[in-house]
Amino acid sequence: MKTKEVVDDITMNRAITRITYEIIERNKDLNQVVLAGIKTRGVHLAHRIQKRLAQLENIDIPVAEVDTKPFRDDIKVEEDTTVIPVDITDRQVILIDDVLYTGRTIRAAIDNLVSHGRPSRVGLAVLVDRGHRELPIRADYVGKNIPTSQTEEIIVEMTETDGQDRVLIMGE
């Protein structure tokens, strides 16, 4: 298996900053926004975006932690470890994940969100969009488009869990 680094720490930070600026531009009332990170790396990304929003706009946006496992169609887990610190009804929720691939994780995350309230709108921000969708799901905010083959794998490493920031592509 060959492994190649396709995004380094500087490029990753720039992508997160770009996503943050796009969130500011597209959301007129940031007080209505809730960032919802999909466990695990999506939560880290959400906190980084939250921190940048605080620096740029002097606003404290709430961050939810969304567990997709109880809502997936391929595995069954009963315990839902989702943490949503505010009522999301009539709020603009931006789901955040590290990689968008088939769309199935996002579908499960949306199912989880609507079990907790009725957002006025749900957006999607991803660090990497690798293509190969199985469901009609599209990201509103994309850090990097990295086309892959079905046999390749994208691995996102983040300082919080892996000790460094980078994106790797693994293939034959």
Curated annotation (Swiss-Prot):
Keywords: Glycosyltransferase, RNA-binding, Transcription, Transcription regulation, Transcription termination, Transferase. Homodimer and homohexamer; in equilibrium. The lineage of its organism: Bacteria, Bacillati, Bacillota, Bacilli, Lactobacillales. It catalyses: UMP + diphosphate = 5-phospho-alpha-D-ribose 1-diphosphate + uracil. CDD domains: PRTases_typeI. This is Bifunctional protein PyrR. Regulates transcriptional attenuation of the pyrimidine nucleotide (pyr) operon by binding in a uridine-dependent manner to specific sites on pyr mRNA. This disrupts an antiterminator hairpin in the RNA and favors formation of a downstream transcription terminator, leading to a reduced expression of downstream genes. Also displays a weak uracil phosphoribosyltransferase activity which is not physiologically significant. GO terms for biological process: DNA-templated transcription termination. Transmembrane segments: none annotated. It is an enzyme of class 2 (transferase). Belongs to the purine/pyrimidine phosphoribosyltransferase family. PyrR subfamily. GO terms for molecular function: RNA binding; uracil phosphoribosyltransferase activity. Pfam families: Pribosyltran. Its EC number is 2.4.2.9. Gene3D superfamilies: 3.40.50.2020. A motif (PRPP-binding) lies at residues 93-105.
